[in-house]
Every structure is written in structure tokens, then in C-alpha cells.
Amino acid sequence: MRSKILSTLVMSFAAMLFGSHEVRAEHRVTIDTLTQLVAAFNAHDLDAVMSFFADDCELMMPRGPDPWGQRYVGKAPVRKGLATRFEGIPDVHYGEVHNWVSGNHGVSQWTLTGTTKDGKKIMVRGCDLLEFRHGKIIRKDSYWKIVEPTK
């Protein structure tokens, strides 16, 4: 009996420390979740995009002054950071999309196309590494290929 109580206490403590891996159905991340997120980006609907994010979310853009890119923390700063994407590339589109999900993590691979405000055409392959909690994005880490002009 004593070992059963000890075992239960240890398991409860471990779940408290490391989190439970059990995901409730309404919080489950699916391929459809990622598909809807990309659709919101392609619709340039910032309200719809932000509905996928938790209040304490974090965004790491592919470019910026630090090795991890420009970093935004919190829902309002993340919204502002994402708005710069739509402002800088007004016709931005994510195509050739492939999504993967494992537990509370997702990967969305895509080809970004668009035209910058100064008329430069962009086509670049990239991906987002996404981490979810309770069905909402808590971390979006974006990567782009480095495209160099041919000589």
C-alpha cells in the first residue's frame, strides 16, 4: 500500500513539473488547425490569424538583429510583428503548403510569394515551427531559405 501511495505521489509530482501529455479533444492540434491558420494568413485577416494565438505567445521572425530573428512577446506585440509582414509584402501568399503535427507541436512548410512595397518580387521556401498549449499557439518560429542572386 505504501509503495502504491508513493508511486501515485511521484507520478502526480512529475505531471505537475513536466506537464501532462494528455491533450483534451477540444485542445488537440490537427492538420486542419494548421490549414486554417495558413488560410487566415492568405486572407490577410489579422483578426483571424490572432485568434490562433495565446495571450502569452511569442513570435520569432526569420530576420532581425539577433540570431533568432526579430522577437515579439505577448499578443499585442506579436500582432504588430505580423502586421509588418502584410505591410511589407502587401500581396503575400503562402502556397505549396505541407503541414505536420505531433502532439502540441506543428510544422507548416510553404513557399512564400509576393511583391515588396518597392516592387521587388519574392519567392522563398520556408517553414514555421509551432508550439501549442490548450489549442493556442504559444510559439511561432519562422525560417526562410537564404536566396542569393545568381551571378
Regions found by a protein language model. Give the residues of each.
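A short hydrophobic beta-strand element
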Residues: G103-L112
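A solvent-exposed, acidic/Ser-Thr-rich amphipathic alpha-helical stretch
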Residues: L46, S51-V101
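Bacterial N-terminal signal peptides
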Residues: T8-L17
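Twin-arginine (Tat) signal peptide motif
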Residues: M1-S7
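Short, low-complexity N-terminal intrinsically disordered segments enriched in polar/charged residues
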Residues: K4, L17-S51, D55, K151
